[in-house]
Amino acid sequence: MMVIRPVERSDVSALMQLASKTGGGLTSLPANEATLSVRIERAIKTWQGELPKSEQGYVFVLEDSETGTVAGICAIEVAVGLNDPWYNYRVGTLVHASKELNVYNALPTLFLSNDHTGSSELCTLFLDPKWRKEGNGYLLSKSRFMFMAAFRDKFNDKVVAEMRGVIDEHGYSPFWQSLGKRFFSMDFSRADFLCGTGQKAFIAELMPKHPIYTHFLSQEAQDVIGQVHPQTAPARAVLEKEGFRYRNYIDIFDGGPTLECDIDRVRAIRKSRLVEVAEGQPAQGDFPACLVANENYHHFRVVLVRTDPATERLILTAAQLDALKCHAGDRVRLVRLCAEEKTA
């Protein structure tokens, strides 16, 4: 059974294996054991209530409960940009016009922005390619909404997600090549590694401070603004179906889109509800997949179950109860895994 649980110190080697499979561009999952150990420690201290909000971050792993194999990772930053500035570009427009010359030009322009400061962030989503089946990707991504719904007071009103931009298998980023490299004088992979290992001071020191006309970039770079890496397209679609939208903010490194949503408008958060759980043999039927989570802050668990999402009393097997660390009579959080398709 696949189970979402909080990260543990013993997971560091498994996270290193996952990091080696990302192909670069996933800034928050560098293949650096010291950095990953620090990240795990920060998550543990967050759960223990030892950190200020500006430093809090939760990390979860997807585990096969039968073998102990860690198949994926996902995380939530509680409030970005309160310690180190959180940069992105806002894609806007500058108009240059002259009535005398009968000239009017509306030029797409990149403006350096800290507009998402204080927002909660969904980040570090990665599923081992071998495990991209049977709803594991949906479980991994959406489990965070169950945690946010259960512990709403831990998070701010807006949640954002930076989507991985267009990078090829050799680590070549058209957006970086045309823009970032001119200011940072280093390859994308080097900048990505520095950022991922917490060495972010160079961003503030070297970032262009003035608006940038996108027409000055290569056509290849212009074409990838707000576009996602092919492997990230499914993750973008998942978030958009939950209510997230692209509001013209992009990543400063690879030009990938930043999606955002008011937390209370996220479908899985808004529609999740508490039901009583009982032990038994679940009813047979053509039921949809549903997320089921306990309400235990320190021992949080999420699993996928096929059941009636409208049920008032959820019947689970002993194995499912054990995976959720629940007992009969406890209340669990339940929501349909995917939004119902609207019919004409």
Swiss-Prot record:
* Catalytic reaction equation(s): succinyl-CoA + L-arginine = N(2)-succinyl-L-arginine + CoA + H(+)
Pathway the protein takes part in: Amino-acid degradation; L-arginine degradation via AST pathway; L-glutamate and succinate from L-arginine: step 1/5
Record InterPro entries:
Acyl_CoA_acyltransferase, Arg_succinylTrfase_AstA/AruG, Arginine_N-succinylTrfase
What UniProt keywords apply to this chain's record, in alphabetical order?
Acyltransferase, Arginine metabolism, Transferase
Q: What class of enzyme is it?
A: transferase
Protein name in UniProt: Arginine N-succinyltransferase
- Give yes or no: UniProt keyword Ligase: no
What HAMAP family does its record include?
AstA (MF_01171)
State its role.
Answer: Catalyzes the transfer of succinyl-CoA to arginine to produce N(2)-succinylarginine.
Entry similarity comment: Belongs to the arginine N-succinyltransferase family.
Origin organism lineage: Bacteria, Pseudomonadati, Pseudomonadota, Gammaproteobacteria, Enterobacterales
Active site (catalytic residues): 229
The UniProt record lists the EC number as: 2.3.1.109
Which processes are annotated in GO (biological process)? arginine catabolic process to glutamate; arginine catabolic process to succinate
Binding positions (succinyl-CoA): 125
